[in-house]
């Protein structure tokens, strides 16, 4: 089921930090991992990626995999270089204070699942 990123932001109380014009876009699934190599091997185009990573390499991986957006959990603030790269690559970064387990549960309740 495809869900608009803005709906995710609104329902989970997230703070968008980059690529604001892409919030009207949709995600078609989700993936949670903190290992970049795992995301490169297993995430699908259109996924929302849930991670605690904040460095700019997450943007490179998201761009490579055509990820719909990155959710950074636990209130961790991304580096300024990460946000600049995300804007350049047009990758939405969403910030939440929630832990990964709760974020994934709420996304699932919205109809977003992994393993398509």
Regions found by a protein language model. Give the residues of each.
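Feature captures the catalytic cores and cofactor-binding loops of soluble hydro-lyases/lyases
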Residues: 24-25, 33-48, 52-116
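N-terminal, charge-rich interaction modules
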Residues: 1-20
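Conserved phosphate/pyrophosphate-binding and hydrolysis machinery centered on Walker-type P-loop NTPases
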Residues: 29
């Amino acid at each position: 089921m495809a869900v608009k990123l803005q709906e995710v932001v609104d329902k989970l109380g997230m703070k968008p930090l980059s690529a604001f014009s892409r919030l009207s876009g949709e995600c078609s699934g989700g993936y949670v991992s903190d290992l970049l190599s795992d995301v490169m091997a297993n995430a699908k185009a259109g996924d929302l990626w849930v991670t605690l990573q904040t460095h700019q390499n997450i943007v490179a991986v998201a761009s490579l995999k055509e990820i719909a957006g990155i959710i950074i959990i636990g209130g961790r603030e991304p580096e300024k270089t990460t946000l600049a790269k995300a804007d350049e690559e047009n990758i939405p970064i969403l910030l939440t204070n929630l832990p990964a387990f709760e974020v994934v549960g709420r996304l699932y309740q919205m109809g977003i699942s992994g393993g398509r």
